[in-house]
Structures are given as C-alpha cells and as structure tokens.
Amino acid sequence: MLNEFKQFIMRGNAIDLAVGVVMGAAFTSIVKSIVTNLIGPIIGIFAGAVDLSSLKFSIGPAVFKYGAVLNQVINFIIVGFIIFLIIKAINKFFKKNEKKEDAEAESEVKLLTDIRAELKKSNQSTNKA
C-alpha cells in the first residue's frame, strides 16, 4: 500500500497539481495585496473611503459590508483575467507545436507513399523479368 501511494505521488499529474495549488495560493496573496493596497485606495478616492473594506450600510441591526465583497470581486476578476492570459499563451504554444507535428507527419506520409510506389515499381519489374 505504501508503494502504491509512492507511485501515485510521484506521477507527474499529482506533482503538477501540488505545484499549481502552491503557486495559486502565492499568486492569490499577491493579487489580494495589490487590490487592498493599490487598486482599493484608487477606487476609494472616488467612493469616498480610502479603505474599500470599510464601505458598509446598515438596515436596522444588520450590517452589510459591501466594500469587502467589492475587494473580493476585484481579486476574482484580476486572478481570472491572468489565468485566462496564461491559458491563452499555453494554448498558442501547443497549437504551434501541433502545426509542426502535422507538417512533419505530412512529409513522413509523402515519403512513405513514394517508397511504396518505388517498391511497387520494383516488384512489377521483377515479376516481368
């Protein structure tokens, strides 16, 4: 059972996932800091509050902290956009490699077709003689 677990952990997918989770957590903390310390104050200038998370309204005893939600929405949009850009770049990279492989495959098919034609000619001339 220990060996099976070791094989599972050492597979590329599990390691890639672990690295992705750690990088995602680090990236999220950076984006959160940027939103809280840079973007939030800029928006806060126009909203009338320096700290967006302090924006709130009350209805009776209920307090609605919409500033904190606004911070999280901005975080989500930034992280989502950057992930979109990363995936777009990865797809573009794989598409270029796929085109190269297709071109190589086409040249291999042409070469094999030419070899087959020559073998047919060779067999026909051998059979006639």
UniProtKB/Swiss-Prot annotation:
One of its GO terms (cellular component) is plasma membrane. Pfam families: MscL. It comes from the Bacteria. The keyword Cell cycle does not apply. Its main location: membrane. InterPro entries: MS_channel, MSC/AndL, MscL_channel. One of its GO terms (molecular function) is mechanosensitive monoatomic ion channel activity. Channel that opens in response to stretch forces in the membrane lipid bilayer. May participate in the regulation of osmotic pressure changes within the cell. PANTHER family: LARGE-CONDUCTANCE MECHANOSENSITIVE CHANNEL, MECHANOSENSITIVE CHANNEL MSCL. Homopentamer. Belongs to the MscL family. HAMAP family: MscL. This is Large-conductance mechanosensitive channel.
